[in-house]
Regions:
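Class I S-adenosyl-L-methionine
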Residues: 2-88, 263, 269-272, 276-279, ...
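Glycine-rich SAM-binding Motif I of class I
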Residues: 257-261
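Class I SAM-dependent methyltransferase SAM-binding "motif I" and its flanking Rossmann-like core
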Residues: 57-133, 305, 366-390, 394-399
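Beta-strand/loop-alpha-helix module characteristic of Rossmann-like adenine-cofactor folds
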Residues: 6, 76-77, 86-219
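S-adenosylmethionine
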Residues: 277-279, 298-379
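Conserved SAM-binding loop
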Residues: 285-286
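Conserved class I S-adenosyl-L-methionine
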Residues: 246-255
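Core SAM-dependent methyltransferase catalytic element
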Residues: 196-202, 382-411
């Protein structure tokens, strides 16, 4: 640093260390100009000048070094790490951190976290991580503060499951560490701008069933029932959707939310987008969402296809209700599906089955392959001191697949 011809850094780092630079050294402030840094460094190298990029802590841990490595020759880089603020925070608290998950909540400020927030929210990765890890080390941002993180835990129903520690101004004047804060307390506190957060579980994480939940696990419309994809049809439909851990799923006509919520548990690194037009059913699906404890599920009140244009292209689409828009929804789903994706639909009436078959036939020339399975299940029922079988209504499960080699397209 003392011999560098060019020193690049943030406003604060340059001001803090400017007295160490050699006389005549050029300085570049990267604040708001990160994309220019590789060009500045490359230009200095071509001019046979030495260049130093200042970073705090370990630049290989959510720092600038990986970015520079992607845009410059790796062999041209020499990384000199310091202690990271996360290391220092754990040392202050005496906490082992080899098994902790590190999460950064830097990014565009999307405001307060709401249940069902989309993947673009700055707290989304953290909301997912708290479901899967016992201890988390969080690099905060000016918008996503410790207090907002605490409010996120409360919004997700995890206020009694985690404790927090907030380390402020580490290795600086005014250093302070708040240990064992309850989220309810931290949610209303103010902290110094320079801080990191540590989260750890105060009670064991639940290990929920991911697939094949009984119908009784879901709240349903009372006194009349029936607006639920029942266990047998749900299990077959989810199997035919060919879900992966990171799948993007659409659930059109969510009703109670049973298919979409189970898909969310099966796709912990993916996301489920659900829509329901009936207000009462939407409220029930929201109730089930709150009970299921998944953060990768967004539920919308509306009638498809309105609103679907803003959803990301799906790997799988489930249509449980069409609101009279079936042919158009099928065409939209097949157009938006990613290559190798699957469309699954459930029907109990001849009219909807015939409409679906006609719509799918019209897409056969595009390489769409489809089939129909009639599911006829019967469940045992007591009769006196014996048992009999009571038939459930037959369900047609209609499945269509998009060729793996076919390019996806937008709306």
């Amino acid at each position: 640093m003392r011999t560098a011809d060019l020193v690049i850094g943030g406003t604060r780092a340059l001001a803090l260390l400017s007295h160490e630079f050699k006389a005549g050294a050029a300085q570049r402030d990267l604040t708001g100009q990160l994309a220019q840094v590789p060009q500045w460094a490359q230009a200095a190298r071509q001019a046979s000048q030495s260049c130093v990029v200042l970073a705090t802590g370990d630049p290989l841990c959510h720092g600038i070094a990986p970015y520079l490595a992607r845009h410059l020759c790796v062999n041209a880089l020499r990384v000199l790490p310091n202690l990271s603020t996360l290391q220092v925070a754990c040392a202050r608290l005496g906490l082992a951190w080899q098994d902790a998950r590190i999460v950064s909540v830097h990014g565009k400020d999307a405001g307060e976290w709401q249940r069902g927030s989309a993947p673009g929210h700055g707290l989304y990765a953290l909301a997912q991580a708290v479901r899967a890890h016992e201890r988390l080390l969080v690099l905060t941002s000016p918008g996503n503060t410790p207090a907002r993180i605490a409010r996120m835990l409360l919004a997700e129903g995890l206020g009694d499951d985690f404790l927090m520690a907030v380390a402020e101004n580490l290795l600086q004047p005014g250093e302070r560490v708040h240990a064992e804060l309850a989220p309810q307390e931290a949610a209303g506190m103010d902290f110094a701008p320079l801080n990191v957060v540590i989260l750890w579980r105060s009670r064991p994480a639940p290990q929920p069933v991911r697939f094949g939940l009984p119908d009784a696990a879901y709240a349903q419309r009372q006194p009349e029932k029936g607006l639920i994809t029942k266990l047998e049809a749900r299990a077959l439909s989810l199997a035919r959707m060919q879900l992966r851990a990171n799948s993007v799923v659409w659930d059109i006509g969510a009703a109670t939310g049973s298919v979409g919520l189970e898909a969310a548990r099966l796709c912990p690194q993916g996301h489920v987008w659900a829509i329901e037009k009936n207000g009462a059913d939407h409220a029930i699906a929201a109730q089930n969402h709150a009970a299921f404890g998944v953060s990768n599920y967004s539920l919308h009140l509306g009638k498809a296809p309105q609103g679907l244009e803003s959803w990301p292209d799906p790997d799988a689409v489930f249509i449980g209700g069409s609101g009279g828009e079936l042919p158009g929804l099928i065409a939209l789903a097949l157009r938006r599906l990613r290559a190798g994706g699957h469309l699954v639909m459930n029907f109990v009436t001849f009219e909807n089955l015939n409409a679906a078959c006609d719509a799918l036939k019209a897409h056969e020339a595009q390489g769409i392959e489809w089939d129909v399975t009639q599911l006829q299940a019967a469940r045992s029922r007591p009769i006196l001191d014996m048992h009999r079988l009571a038939a459930e209504n037959p369900v047609w499960v209609v499945c269509a697949g998009k060729p793996a080699s076919q390019e996806r397209s937008g709306v």
